[in-house]
Amino acid sequence: MDGQETSGPGPGYPPYWEADVVLSDGGTAHVRPIRPDDADRLVTFFHRWSAETVYRRFFTVRSELTPAEIERFVNVDHHDRVAILAELGGEMVALARYDRLPDSNEAEVAFVVEDAHQGRGLGSVLLEHLAAAARERGVGSFLAEVLPGNRQMVGVFTDAGYVARREYGDGVVRLSFPIERTELSESVMRSREHRAEARSVERLLVPHSVAVIGASREQGSIGRRLLDNLLIGDFAGEVYAVNAAGGEIGGHTAYRSVCDVPGDVDLALVATPAATVLDVVEDCARKGVKGLVIVSSGFAETGAEGLALQRQVVATARANGMRVVGPNCLGVINTDPEIRLNATLAPASPGRGRVGFFCHAGALGIAILEQVEARGLGLSTFVSAGNRADVSGNDMLQLWQEDPATDVVLLYLESFGNPRKFGRIARRVARRKPVVAVKGARSLTGPPAWLAGSGVRANDTAVDELFRQSGVIRVETLTALFDTAVLLAHQPLPAGRNVAVVGNSAALALLAADACVASGLEVAVSVDVGAEGTAEEFREALGRTLSREDVDAVVTVFVPGLTQPEPDLAGVLSDVTFDATKPVVSTFYGFLGVAAPGSVPSYRSPEAGVQALARAVEYAEWRARPVGHVPDLEVDLSVAHAVLEQALLEQPDGGTLSAEETGRLLASYGIEVLPTVHADSADEAVAAAELAGYPVAVKSTSARLRHRTDIGSVHLDLHDAGSVAAAYEAVAMLGERTVGVQPMASGVATVVGLSDDASFGPLVSFGLAGVATDLLGDVGYRSLPLTDVDAAGLVRSVRAAPLLFGHRGDDPVDVDALEGLLLRLALLADRHPEVVGVELNPVLVATHGISVLSATVRVQPSPPSWDDEARRLG
């Protein structure tokens, strides 16, 4: 192929189409557009096809590609002719392409997957990426011709969630289908993403063989501790020691390289110096290792050079089918008695339990594991991700969603890699099981150094809203995390907010009752068995209280050392609540934890127990709410695309849209802005008012003054020419010679906005208009995607919301129309990443309908975000 190959990606190459992807078996591959220098790879790829694969692709038998075909296949324009390949270990293993038909928005497509990699989901992944590229380039439909016997390829198209039309003729099946995103295609993609990413993490946690690379003879060294912990924990599979010097370590043969290990290696624990890790990863690729846990330090936490090395290590691993935990991490644990994996630096593994735990910090992980043991929690699985260069909390949520061994999920997060994906997955997981999270690094102005390049620090308000919207229980400290976890792991969820207090100390009962009120709970009854109460009296009081229909949960408080020793009361508590359907928490002063699985958690203070209970109540209420959906709204995408494309041609660096552009863009999404006529004199203002019809409003057009009713820059409800002229002169006295004249609209004044948060992407905001709202910060936020339930919650989240619902005898306003506006704005933001800011201020909400009086839209050039278009890691 010498002489035909052109170096480099070629003109128009879209680098943001590149992605690492997870396949259906949990392995990884790299997806990218084809390049002219792929000619040799293409020929080698073709020569690995079976005769059947060749026939299915070309409908004929052939042994070679012609030079003209090769030239055409690798030279594309990335617009009307697009080809996307998947590569593994630097070799092409699958290829998909489309060719647009002349003067059409239809394109013919063709796919081929190498025989050795068929059945791994490569076809469906490439279809997602090819369709995303096609939509970006204005292609609306795909056409494909497939042999009737090629059921796998027919399935790639028909199982993707698209509605395909089939025709039979000339011995082939002709398929045609629109490629617009639909609820079904989105659901199919998310389901495949979930299964693939869960499987990729499962390969790390359920290995049949483990190699410790960097195992050492030196007691206490990192490599030796990893090896010893595997052996002490009685790992169920094969353990191999790898040391460059060879010999023997702890009675085990030490192999000089992982490539020398006689058996297969599923998981490699890497504990070699940072400078050697890339070579180790390449050896693991040659060996066929399925996953890596890199405990070595010296990467992103050390600065720019370490970050560059870390990225190279992860890219090499992913390109060769491997996921990575770390680097700079503590390791992973799986307490399944069939696995018994302690691949960490921690001296002891916690007992078996129903809790899955993910954390960032390596060193902190040891303290966390000690607390887990002290609280009697027990774990199903544990992952310390360190620098979190690859495997993240999102991956673990994918695994834990359907993991029958995990009932409660705990997260200690210091940054987010992909917050939008986190919100989407967490919302799904939290519908099944509680997710409790500590968001650390609040005091930092940026991401922690050890997470440089792999995440960004989110503003705290956005974090709160993301967690609340996703059903994640946010706590401030690790202590609160464990307080909440022991309750959720051992007690049922409360059905309501009514709490009973039962105990032998009036003082403690009062503290518990006060804590309930402070936490938003209702005290239904308080039962005091007295300081001299017996265990049987307590048994009877607790049983009677639990049977009350007006009680949803019970808080028990005890001072030890009275007539009954503490163990007797604890036993009674466990007996009475064994099959209870209501949660019970207790305070035994001097005792913390749980006696056994299913027993009642005990806290050092009533306040701690009540706060944990309150969190469980809020979570149960969230879970009981409808899931909601993103409604299918009618919009004019062609107009929106045209407005934005023209605006960015005129302002290549971005900027604010003109009033005319703003009106057209918003109208394409069903958001009408009340027309405004600008006037530069009193006579022009009167003429504009006569044209609009009285009453009218006259206001300054200055961004500084146009909302300042307090200083005379806004004049409302003007009914005649004289008042309009006077209003113009009043505004002119402020130094503004141009005013806006609008038809008068009425309603409660609100502000709707869209901002592009550096961490979370687009956030939709809502608040009531006015200085008081600004001063109090009474603004609510929601991240995308926005469901109808989210929109309703956003409107009701602000403290001033009662003004919308008939406050003090006023008529309630049209909240449905307001929620519809929020949904349309959210859809605009979701479809057009170029739109980075919108302010609708004010939006008047009347008893029937809404009026948008003023709108500002900011745009900036931005390559499409494919987070929601096609599966990708990162």
Regions found by a protein language model. Give the residues of each.
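Catalytic-core regions of core metabolic enzymes
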Residues: 180-874
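Long, contiguous binding/interaction regions
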Residues: 2-203, 207
